[in-house]
Amino acid sequence: MVVYTVVFIPPELKEDTYQPQPVRQHPIPKRDKPGEYRMLGIPAIYDRVCQQALLNRLEPIFEPIFDDASFGYRRGRSTKDALRKVWKEIQSGSEWIVDADLRDFFGSVDHEKLLTLVAQRVADGRVLRLIEAMLKAGSYGKGQLFPSERGTPQGGVVSPTLSNILLTPFDREMRLRGYQLTRYADDCVPRAQRQRNRLLECVTT
């Protein structure tokens, strides 16, 4: 059986005239922190279509360079795969383990740094302008419009891949320093056989 994939390219993307709408804020309770909320940014339906077209362009370029430590939002990888990797490395002799969560990662993404990393592998200025427009589209909630000078919306189609692009240098740096690492989006588990203090310092700087 032959399976065909139909890809719709919005005309505004071809003409370089597309301007995304602000995302809709949608708070959801944090499971492990009663009374605290995680703010999702839900794009309009048409913007989701445009983000999917962008994702289809970015994935083949960046997927081959993502580190083996990364498991979040990647085809063929799951939380179970990440847990199996952690367990295998624990059994191999890791004495020190840190369960780390990158605080407010999606809300604090540096746009300039992210665009610089994308530009290292994407020369098409239209793609770079599109990403910047999505990042700076802003958000709205409770009748107010909020600018977005930092961050990428949790809830956006392309945000997970952008997060992996931004964190790939971190994955590589941990490996170069001799630490084992498993990362799922902004949650990471670095491990080492010795030097507990240096491991903690490496994660927090």
Question: What are the residue ranges of the model-derived segments?
Answer:
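Glycine-rich active-site/cofactor-binding loop and its immediate structural neighborhood
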Residues: 34-43, 51
